[in-house]
Curated annotation (Swiss-Prot):
Residues 1-15 form the signal peptide. The modification Phosphoserine is found at residues 30, 32-34. This is Beta-casein. Important role in determination of the surface properties of the casein micelles. Pfam families: Casein (PF00363). Belongs to the beta-casein family.
Length: 232
């Protein structure tokens, strides 16, 4: 009986040892696999980090080559979104009673009475009557006077049939307008009437009836020939 008990104990102990070895081997395998996975993960992380560094350096180089100013958005730390209620589409605001605004009447300002401007009256100067030259009758030449002038026959005939024309009476100075005090005083200048000019005798009518007279200095000069015989 003791031997059986010892054999059972030894078998149990061996079985336990085998189980322990199995568990230890499994643990070692799991640890080794975990280590391998950890190393693999670390390698992947290192590769990713290297790739990111390369991309960052390339991006920096491109930014240095192409530099464009970009507008920076202003960010305020103290600002917060304003909450507002979301109203339904069929929502209508409440009706408010109509308020009557008082009608403002414009104030009528009293217009100050302006003083009437007193205009000084202008003193009228008396009219200066212009003296009128009395009409002098034109003296008509008689036949005896014409004969004494020793004029040619055609000229005498034209003078005999010529009717003497009276000279129209005109005032010496036209009426002057009223002069104000602000204007300068102008003294009237007396004007003499110009007599009516008589018709001049043409030279061509006189030349045929003149005879040349010898002159030692100037030469020959025509002398009028008498038409009427002179009574001695």
């Amino acid at each position: 009986m003791k031997v059986l008990i010892l054999a059972c104990r030894v078998a149990l102990a061996l079985a336990r040892e085998k189980e322990e070895f199995k568990t230890a081997g499994e643990a070692l395998e799991s640890i080794s696999s975990s280590e391998e996975s950890i190393t693999h993960i670390n390698k992947q992380k290192i590769e990713k980090f290297k790739i990111e560094e390369q991309q960052q350096t390339e991006d920096e180089q491109q930014d240095k080559i192409y530099t464009f100013p970009q507008p920076q958005s202003l960010v305020y730390s103290h600002t917060e979104p304003i909450p507002y209620p979301i109203l339904p589409q069929n929502f209508l605001p409440p009706l408010q009673p109509a308020v009557m605004v008082p009608f403002l009447q414009p104030k009528v300002m009293d217009v100050p009475k302006t003083k009437e401007t007193i205009i000084p009256k202008r003193k009228e100067m008396p009219l200066l009557q212009s003296p009128v030259v009395p009409f002098t009758e034109s003296q008509s030449l008689t036949l005896t006077d014409l004969e004494n002038l020793h004029l040619p026959l055609p000229l005498l005939q034209s003078l005999m049939y010529q009717i003497p024309q009276p000279v129209p009476q005109t005032p010496m100075i036209p009426p002057q307008s009223l002069l104000s005090l602000s204007q300068f005083k102008v003294l009237p200048v007396p004007q003499q009437m110009v007599p009516y000019p008589q018709r001049a005798m043409p030279v061509q009518a006189v030349l045929p009836f003149q005879e040349p007279v010898p002159d030692p200095v100037r030469g020959l000069h025509p002398v009028p020939q008498p038409l009427v015989p002179v009574i001695a």
